[in-house]
């Protein structure tokens, strides 16, 4: 991620200098040559990597995956009056496009706009979906942990087995600053008055692969996808599939998600 960001910025700087110094190309020739060499090396390495990945894919065991995107408007998502409608939408879409046999169905981050861990009719509906399709179901849900000092909230991903039981859970460990927590809040209590609307989530315990049969699944939640070290850690721990579940509905009809 960081290296690619550098290359994008560097190439744009070279193009800018070519325009500014178009009457004196010799002045920007060194950086132009450097840019061309970097792009050539990246292209060559990319081709080599793609060929290696194709070879590994041909040898790997396949799993059918269905990605379900409900496109629930953020303005109504957390309204209790629309919870049943949201889950019914995900249920219908999942049943329509399910792998039907030990595949994987993936819903987005916070797809269940309630605490799935609490026994309820809607939680039972969600648990019943993998039973109907005989597939695994991965989805995001808010969660909480009652401790002596109070209740801690997490941004979590749950994995349900084909029998509808919770096979694993991952709590987001790399939280969004000023979105899911406020840095230094413990040391500067007065910040609470300035950012009352900001979430204060509990950080998860770090990289934790979820087991699907004989395979390990690496789960990343939204913002965690920009940190390559997280994906690398999953790979080093044996994960054969990485899944990033995200809710970009916060951005509404803007260019931000793109």
Language-model segments: what does each one mean?
Residues 54-68, 207-218:
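Beta-strand-turn-beta hairpins that frame and shape the catalytic cleft
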Residues 37-52, 62-75, 245:
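Transmembrane alpha-helical segments
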Residues 1-53, 88, 95, 253:
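Membrane-embedded alpha-helical bundles of multi-pass enzymes
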Residues 79, 84-88, 92-95, 99-258:
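Solvent-exposed soluble domains appended to multi-pass membrane proteins
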Residues 24-30, 66-68, 178-182, 203-205:
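A broad, low-specificity signal for short, low-complexity segments enriched in glycine/proline
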Residues 21-30, 54-60, 145-151, 165, ...:
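Short, glycine- and charge-enriched coil/turn segments that flank and shape catalytic ligand pockets
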């Amino acid at each position: 991620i960081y290296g690619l960001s550098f290359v994008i910025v560097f190439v744009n700087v070279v193009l800018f200098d070519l325009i500014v110094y178009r009457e004196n190309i010799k002045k920007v020739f060194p950086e132009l040559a450097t840019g061309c060499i970097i792009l050539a090396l990246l292209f060559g390495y990319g081709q080599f990597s793609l060929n290696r990945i194709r070879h590994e894919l041909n040898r790997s065991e396949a799993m059918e995956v269905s990605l379900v995107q409900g496109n629930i408007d953020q303005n109504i998502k957390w309204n209790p009056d629309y919870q049943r409608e949201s889950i019914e939408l995900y249920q219908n879409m999942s049943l329509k496009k399910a792998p039907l046999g030990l595949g994987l169905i993936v819903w987005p981050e916070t797809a269940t706009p309630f605490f799935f861990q609490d026994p309820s009719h809607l939680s039972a509906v969600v648990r019943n979906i993998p039973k109907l399709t005989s597939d695994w179901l991965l989805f995001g849900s808010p969660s909480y942990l009652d401790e002596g000092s109070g209740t801690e909230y997490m941004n979590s991903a749950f994995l349900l087995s084909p029998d509808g039981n919770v096979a694993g859970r991952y709590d987001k460990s790399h939280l969004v600053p000023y979105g899911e927590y406020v840095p230094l809040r413990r040391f500067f209590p007065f910040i609470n008055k300035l950012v009352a609307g900001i979430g204060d989530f509990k950080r998860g315990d770090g990289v934790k692969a979820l087991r699907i049969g004989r395979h390990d699944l690496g789960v990343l939640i939204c913002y965690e996808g920009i940190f390559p070290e997280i994906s690398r850690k999953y790979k080093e721990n044996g994960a054969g599939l990485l899944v990033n579940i995200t809710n970009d509905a916060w951005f509404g009809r803007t260019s931000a998600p793109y």
